[in-house]
Amino acid sequence: MKKPRQQSCLFGVKAFEEAINNQVHIKLVNISIRHKKLIPLIEAKKINFQIHSTNWFNNQYRDINHQELVAVLDTNQLLIPLDQLVKVVENKKCSTLVMLDEIQDPYNFGAILRTCLASEVDGIIFKKNNQVPINNTVMKTSMGSVFYQNLVQVANLSYTITKLKEIGFWTVVSTLDPIWKPIDYRKVDFAKKILIVGNEDRGVNQLITKNADCRIKIPMNNKINSLNVSVALGIILFAWKN
């Protein structure tokens, strides 16, 4: 069965050029005459395009910094199968993967993608359901980082964890719930690990948290209850990287 198409848009020249440079298949480019210098490139790539007025862009993409260039693409092409990710990491002595358990905010998802690229994570795993998809906001917030990473969308996180544990990965869940007695994140020394972060409100699924090899927290001033998920992820990943 074919996957249903998930379409998204790229806005602006820089995002469009990054997509072209990464051989991303673009279905359609909506463009204004101010970008006429790009038309030979678009034609050479055999991409369908339509020329529109400034008013058209402002009406269609209100409140978005469209820059009068909007490229439409199928986001499924940005994903790789789990088996392909396994081949990438199975023979590595050290590797870090990030797993997202039902992230809902597209700005968080986009920021997470940027952080993972900057910290040289080997792959990002997220759910097909109850998870914000790679939409326009995610694409824009990721600042092009979506094109340079191993992105895996799965139906079942627990099954995925089992597959990765078979090739030497350990699971590390980020949680502030004292019932799990999380340790300082700086004490983790697994060579191959999956950092699992959860939903902005509920955190990581209880069963996944219970079965984790390690549960961690970021020690904080007691006047602060929690950190944004993308901020917390960045603190942990860069500490591990360095």
Swiss-Prot record:
| Pfam families tied to this protein | SpoU_methylase, SpoU_sub_bind
Q: Which UniProt keywords apply?
A: Methyltransferase, Transferase
**Does the keyword Methyltransferase belong to this entry?**
yes
Please provide, in alphabetical order, the Gene Ontology terms of the cellular component aspect for this entry: cytoplasm
Q: Which domain of life is it from?
A: Bacteria
Q: Provide the GO biological process annotations.
A: methylation; RNA processing
| Binding positions for S-adenosyl-L-methionine per the UniProt entry | 198, 218, 227
Q: Is the Nucleotidyltransferase keyword given for this protein?
A: no
Record's Gene3D superfamilies? 3.40.1280.10
Q: Fetch the InterPro entries from UniProt.
A: Alpha/beta_knot_MTases (IPR029028), rRNA_MeTrfase_TrmH (IPR004441), SpoU_MeTrfase (IPR001537), SpoU_subst-bd (IPR013123), tRNA_m1G_MTases_N (IPR029026)
EC code(s) of this entry: 2.1.1.-
An example of a GO molecular function for this protein is: RNA binding
Name the family: Belongs to the class IV-like SAM-binding methyltransferase superfamily. RNA methyltransferase TrmH family.
Q: Which NCBIfam families match?
A: rRNA_methyl_3 (TIGR00186)
Protein name from the UniProt record? Uncharacterized tRNA/rRNA methyltransferase MG252
| Organism annotation | Mycoplasma genitalium (strain ATCC 33530 / DSM 19775 / NCTC 10195 / G37) (Mycoplasmoides genitalium)
Q: What is the lineage of its organism?
A: Bacteria, Bacillati, Mycoplasmatota, Mycoplasmoidales, Mycoplasmoidaceae
